[in-house]
Amino acid sequence: MKLLILGESDSHGFGLEDSSQAWGNLLPAELARQSGLEIETTHLAYYAHTATSLSYLERVLAKGPFDIVVFSVTSIGFTLLSVDHRIGRLFGPRIGEFFKSGVDRFDTTTHRKGDEGWVKKANRAAHALARNTIGQEPMASYEFVLENHKKIVARLARLEDTEVVILGPTDHGGRLAQRVRKTQPQVETFRAIVRAEAERRRLTWIDRQKLSEMFADRDAEFVDGLHKGPRFHGRIVSAILGVLARSSPVLTGSAR
């Protein structure tokens, strides 16, 4: 059975101590266990906010056909603001990347050394100063991210003999949720529009926001406000397996 996962850093286990607990790594193992089949998996970090996302998707799909495709919808393209994105727009991508590499080195020697103390406070102060003096921008506009997601959903809907599962985006957690609260109305509209596109084309939609709200302490299920913890990953896999058990020919015994 051929499985395509159009995932992200979260599906690959970013932030987890054990990346095998990430939903994108758990899913193939569970599919193999439940179906008794060998799972040939293509697992990508795929972001719809990039300029080449549509052409890249065509190259990936050309390696099919796939029995199952799972596409993770993300809003980070327009919700996550950064100084390096603004510098990149003003002075060019190369300068933006150079600035980002410098910030990463600074973070390595300050913020990432520990959770408490003056070092972390100095890191936060430096980032705040940069945000206030230089400004921030998203990776792409809301309109661009939305249109690309609609085009991707439409393209996946044209696949024949393929079970397509669309994973809806989740709101960010913890401190990050406060930082991006101004974009919340856009996120809710974005989620509703992409969901409507998926359901109109008879694709399976899994509401990850609703899954997150089932936890007693939602913020505790994130490792950093953006990436999810092990229990959340497990819940995503259970939801995917649940819909596939009802609808996938591969799992219901009528595989081609």
Q: What are the roles of these predicted feature ranges?
A:
Residues 55-230, 234-255:
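Alpha-helical cap/lid subdomain in secreted, periplasmic
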